[in-house]
C-alpha cells in the first residue's frame, strides 16, 4: 500500500478535525482494538487534538502529537502503524513467517501460505478471513509487517497454496520511513 506513496507533498489536507469526528475516530479505533482500552490515556491524551491527513490513493493518516499512529483506506478499518505496534505489541494477534519469507515480506510482497506452514513459521491462534495481524519474522522480536488475512488459518493449513496474508504496511515502506509529518 505504501510502496510508492510519497508523503512529502502528497497530502491534500492536513486538518485538525471537529471534536465529533475526533470522537468517532477514537471510538472506532477503540472498538476495533479492545486491548487499547487499558492504555487509552496514553494513546489518546486529553486536550491533544487528533489530526487527519488525507493523502493520495484515498489514504487517511491519523496523527496525534504530530506522530502517525493509525491509517485507513477510504472508509475501511483502521490499521496501526508499525512504530505504534512496536510500542504496544499485544494489540494485534501474531503470525510468524519462516526465515525464507523475511526478505520478500520486507520488500512488500504478500505472504504466501507456504511461508506460514513451513518449519519455523507459527500460527498459534485461529483467525478468520479479514483479520488484521502482526507478521513476525522467525528469530526476530518485533513485527516486520501488518497484514490482512485472505484465508482463515484453518484454510491456510489445509489448502497451503496461494496468498494467505495481504501485506498492508512493512518495515522500510514510505510510511515507516516518515513517522512524523511536519
From Swiss-Prot:
Pfam families: Pre-PUA, PUA. The gene is mcts1. Residues 92-172 form the PUA domain. The PUA RNA-binding domain is critical for cap binding, but not sufficient for translation enhancer function. MCT1 N-terminal region is required to enhance translation possibly through interaction with other proteins. The lineage of its organism: Eukaryota, Amoebozoa, Evosea, Eumycetozoa, Dictyostelia. The keyword Cytoplasm applies. InterPro entries: MCT-1/Tma20, Pre-PUA, PUA, PUA-like_sf, Uncharacterised_CHP00451. The keyword Transcription regulation applies. May play a role in cell cycle regulation. May play a role as translation enhancer by binding to the cap complex of the 5'-terminus of mRNAs. This is Malignant T-cell-amplified sequence 1 homolog. Keywords: Cell cycle, Cytoplasm, Transcription, Transcription regulation.
Amino acid at each position: 500500500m505504501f510502496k510508492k506513496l510519497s508523503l512529502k507533498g502528497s497530502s491534500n489536507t492536513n486538518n485538525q478535525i471537529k471534536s465529533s469526528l475526533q470522537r468517532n475516530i477514537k471510538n472506532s479505533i477503540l472498538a476495533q482494538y479492545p486491548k487499547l482500552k487499558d492504555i487509552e490515556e496514553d494513546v489518546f491524551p486529553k486536550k491533544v487534538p487528533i489530526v487527519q491527513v488525507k493523502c493520495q490513493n484515498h489514504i487517511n493518516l491519523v496523527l496525534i502529537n504530530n506522530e502517525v499512529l493509525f491509517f485507513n483506506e477510504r472508509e475501511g478499518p483502521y490499521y496501526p502503524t508499525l512504530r505504534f505496534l512496536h510500542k504496544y505489541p499485544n494489540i494485534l494477534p501474531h503470525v510468524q513467517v519462516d526465515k525464507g519469507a523475511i526478505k520478500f515480506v520486507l520488500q512488500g510482497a504478500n505472504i504466501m501460505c507456504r511461508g506460514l506452514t513451513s518449519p519455523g513459521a507459527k500460527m498459534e491462534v485461529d483467525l478468520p478471513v479479514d483479520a488484521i495481524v502482526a507478521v513476525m519474522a522467525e528469530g526476530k522480536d518485533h513485527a516486520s509487517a501488518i497484514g490482512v488475512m485472505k484465508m482463515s488459518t484453518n484454510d491456510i493449513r489445509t489448502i497451503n497454496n496461494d496468498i494467505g496474508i495481504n501485506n498492508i504496511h512493512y518495515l522500510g515502506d514510505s510510511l515507516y520511513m516518515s513517522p512524523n509529518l511536519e
